[in-house]
Amino acid sequence: MARVKRGNIARKRRNKILNLAKGFRGGNKNLFRTANQRVMKALCNAYRDRRRRKRDFRRLWISRINASARINGTNYSKLINGMKNSEIIINRKMLAQLALSDPKCFEKIVSSVSN
């Protein structure tokens, strides 16, 4: 039976982990065991936060819409309900952008919903 030498594969695997650990602090960037643990943790956090980012932005949009709606004499829930009843289809991202960049247009939307 022929002898199997695995040095290249093992080195490639370790270097892949150490390349992923670039930018980490201390031994976490150049000691394989700790780097491996840190990389696994970082990948878990990245996976979790990709899902969390969507929730966070939706919360931000809702709070911006609510703040602008209160300036115009209503609140978020009444505004969204009025938009559904009057069949105005604008998503929360666009509403928040309008509230920030074009307050006059947002004010017209609020007045058309409340009437």
UniProtKB/Swiss-Prot annotation:
Any one Gene Ontology molecular-function term assigned to this protein's record: rRNA binding
Function: Binds directly to 23S ribosomal RNA and is necessary for the in vitro assembly process of the 50S ribosomal subunit. It is not involved in the protein synthesizing functions of that subunit.
Keyword Zinc in annotation: no
One Pfam family this sequence matches: Ribosomal_L20
Protein name: Large ribosomal subunit protein bL20
GO cellular component, as recorded: ribonucleoprotein complex; ribosome
Family annotation (InterPro entries): Ribosomal_bL20, RIBOSOMAL_L20_CS, Ribosomal_protein_bL20_C
GO biological process: ribosomal large subunit assembly; translation
Family: Belongs to the bacterial ribosomal protein bL20 family.
Domain of life of the organism encoding this protein: Bacteria
Keywords: Ribonucleoprotein, Ribosomal protein, RNA-binding, rRNA-binding
